[in-house]
């Protein structure tokens, strides 16, 4: 089956469906790749505890070193970005940030497999994540500081006549931060996928014209390979950016700044 449209790769395709307690459930390519991302992340964590990783070894193998590097990178991120409050330790949120990071990371990496599905290209998914994080951070702030959390919407030293306007601006900005968190991730993944798909299709068509264009076509293939390597780096960067901005939301709720 050939993909005739660059946007066709983002379509949801149901594999099968079933009824449970009078509710209909569908298992689609989105659910498959999202579940596969979670399964790979869990499997790598378990493997890292075995002799093939860093478990039971004073000097871990390359796989263990790579896993430890990612682990301590995220641990340092949480320690630097989420400052402990009087009642809550910032490190207590590390499991959540780590799980969020590896899920997005492997979701981004699986899309680089030919004909793979990009779960993070679904804006409903990325926006759902970001809005859930925003709501959770807001509830955390209310739990820790009660009504004082609304001080986030009122900068100190604001003249009384400007209070309604600035509160509205800060509130809209607060909501926009949550929306932009998901839109940024989804837009970058969509743009990268479309670039590789369109460029790959043009090269394939060009090389199929005749023998001369077939030989010349190997030159733009190097550009496509370079873009693929760039997308590999973007997969890590976008997961890291999502994690660091999530840390910012949590820190603002804990410390009101």
From Swiss-Prot:
Residues 1-4 form a propeptide. It is found in: Mitochondrion inner membrane. Keywords: ATP synthesis, CF(0), Hydrogen ion transport, Ion transport, Membrane, Mitochondrion, Mitochondrion inner membrane, Transmembrane, Transmembrane helix, Transport. CDD domains: ATP-synt_Fo_a_6 (cd00310). Pfam families: ATP-synt_A. SUPFAM superfamilies: F1F0 ATP synthase subunit A (SSF81336). It is a multi-pass membrane protein. The chain crosses the membrane at residues 27-47, 58-78, 93-113, 122-142, 149-169, 189-209, 214-234, 236-256. Its main location: mitochondrion. The keyword Mitochondrion applies. GO terms for cellular component: matrix side of mitochondrial inner membrane; proton-transporting ATP synthase complex. GO terms for molecular function: proton transmembrane transporter activity; structural molecule activity. One of its GO terms (biological process) is proton motive force-driven ATP synthesis. Mitochondrial membrane ATP synthase (F(1)F(0) ATP synthase or Complex V) produces ATP from ADP in the presence of a proton gradient across the membrane which is generated by electron transport complexes of the respiratory chain. F-type ATPases consist of two structural domains, F(1) - containing the extramembraneous catalytic core and F(0) - containing the membrane proton channel, linked together by a central stalk and a peripheral stalk. During catalysis, ATP synthesis in the catalytic domain of F(1) is coupled via a rotary mechanism of the central stalk subunits to proton translocation. F-type ATPases have 2 components, CF(1) - the catalytic core - and CF(0) - the membrane proton channel. CF(1) has five subunits: alpha(3), beta(3), gamma(1), delta(1), epsilon(1). CF(0) has three main subunits: a, b and c. Belongs to the ATPase A chain family. This is ATP synthase subunit a. It comes from Schizosaccharomyces pombe (strain 972 / ATCC 24843) (Fission yeast). The gene is atp6.
